[in-house]
A protein has these predicted regions:
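Nucleotide/pyrophosphate-binding catalytic subdomain
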Residues: 1-216, 296, 385
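Short phosphate-binding/catalytic loops that engage adenosine nucleotides
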Residues: 34, 90, 224, 288, ...
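Conserved beta-strand termini and adjacent loop/short-helix elements that scaffold enzyme active sites
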Residues: 95-97, 229-231, 293
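Short hydrophobic alpha-helical runs that function as membrane-insertion/retention elements
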Residues: 168-172, 226-228, 291, 373
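A conserved regulatory-domain signal marking ACT and ACT-like small-molecule sensing domains
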Residues: 237-405
């Protein structure tokens, strides 16, 4: 007997036929003498539809009402699935996030889960009742519904798994697991059988869409094993677990990419102490996340160019903030570019293997792809390239590291 949290994404519950299919999957797991908790996303397209409705009402839709509105999508799914389970003869009950409660830090539109009360959930399990919970939402200390951000149902599932001390958490989606890269870009991409928390966290934060990064981080901190698998096949999927349980055969585990980035360059910035702090403080104050940073010193050591990347959605605001600071920073000009993409390789194996960066850069050079910015960590190398080169960059890197074998 195992205690399992099963989470189903929007494509898995896209319509009533798929919800009925999911109910059969849950029943099968329950019939195998497991204790089961289910987390669900909104049906595919519902959240986007609610967002559009809010915009038609007001471009300044109140954040607390926005969260209350968007949370309704998952609530619909949870009640439909619970009813479907009951129709199969399984004892089930839907619970809303505030009833449990799942408590958040209260940050509307992008909350972090602070705690989950396990009493209701464990009481259900003790009575062989399957609780079905809407993901993506929780309750603030002000008793307001808050949402956890896009992909937040993954975070809900991992938090619940941690709370009830589940044996593992299963994330069901429309793909067979985590792949070496996006199969839509590289047809030779292969499914990864096992991947470490650290690698998956990098892949998720760098653009891989299968898992939400904060959910992977929570799983890593609390050692919650995750299986990513398809709702529509019987394949075993990808297991996400601690690094010490994996035997690495490849230097590189995967290639990720993101087209959500933009680049800002401040040319001719005065080269003196404190300038970098003045550049990035207003971005911090406005919750703008800075990713890659490059600084070039001029020959006379009096001026420098500072280049950094942010999310594309933040480009307009960032450019405006920098223009306000022009006289204080004393830079000559500002350049903004939203036609870039970030391509990254991830792999714990690169820690002990020399020449990984050379191999990546040489592969890009062979296709005449220019590298604009580079950033690295122990298990990651990222480069910024022209967006038009994204597909070719991913393909040549995937090929040179033989990830199709």
């Amino acid at each position: 007997m195992a205690k399992i949290v099963m989470k189903f994404g929007g494509t898995s519950v896209a319509d009533t036929d798929r919800i009925l299919h999911v109910a059969k999957l849950v029943k099968k797991k329950f019939d195998e003498n497991n204790k089961v908790i289910v987390i669900v996303s909104a049906m595919a397209g519902v959240t986007n539809d609610l967002v559009q409705k809010s915009k038609k009402i007001s471009e300044n839709f109140p954040a607390d009402e926005y969260d209350a509105l968007l949370s309704s999508g998952e609530q619909v799914t949870s009640t439909l699935l619970s009813a479907a389970l009951q129709d199969l003869g399984i004892k089930s009950r839907s619970w809303l996030g505030w009833q449990i409660p799942i408590v958040t830090d209260g940050d509307h539109k992008n909350s972090r889960i602070v705690s989950v009360n396990s009493k209701i959930l464990n009481d259900c399990l003790d009575q062989n009742i399957i609780p079905v919970i809407p993901g993506f939402q929780g309750l603030s200390h002000e008793n307001r519904i808050t949402t956890i951000g896009r992909g937040g149902s993954d975070a809900s599932a991992v938090a619940v798994a941690k709370c009830v001390d589940a044996d593992f958490c299963e994330i069901y989606t429309d793909v067979d697991g985590v792949f070496t890269t996006n199969p839509d870009i590289e047809s030779k991409a292969k499914k990864i059988d096992k991947i470490s928390y650290e690698e998956m966290l990098e892949m998720a934060s760098l653009g891989a869409k299968v898992m939400q990064s904060s959910s992977v981080q929570t799983a890593m901190i609390n050692d919650v094993e995750i299986y990513v698998k398809s709702t529509f096949t019987n394949n075993p999927g990808t297991q996400i677990l601690s690094e010490d349980k994996i035997s690495y055969e490849n230097v590189i585990t995967g290639v990720a990419y993101s087209k959500d980035d933009a680049k800002i360059t401040l040319q001719g910035v005065k080269d003196k102490p404190g300038v970098a702090s003045k550049i990035f403080k207003p971005l911090f104050d406005n919750n703008i996340v800075v990713d890659m940073i490059v600084q070039n010193i001029s020959a006379d050591n009096k001026k420098t160019d500072v280049t950094f990347t942010i999310k594309r959605d933040d480009l307009k605001k960032t450019k405006s903030l920098m223009e306000v600071l022009k006289s204080e920073l004393g830079y000559d000009s500002i350049l903004a570019d939203d036609q870039v993409s970030k391509v990254s390789i991830v792999g714990a194996g690169m820690i002990t293997h020399p020449g990984v960066a050379y191999k990546m850069f040489n592969a890009l050079s062979s296709k005449n792809i220019n590298i604009q910015v580079i950033s690295t960590s122990e298990i990651k190398i990222s480069v910024l390239v022209d967006e038009k080169n994204t597909k070719e960059a991913v393909q040549v890197i995937h090929q040179v590291f033989e990830l199709d074998k």
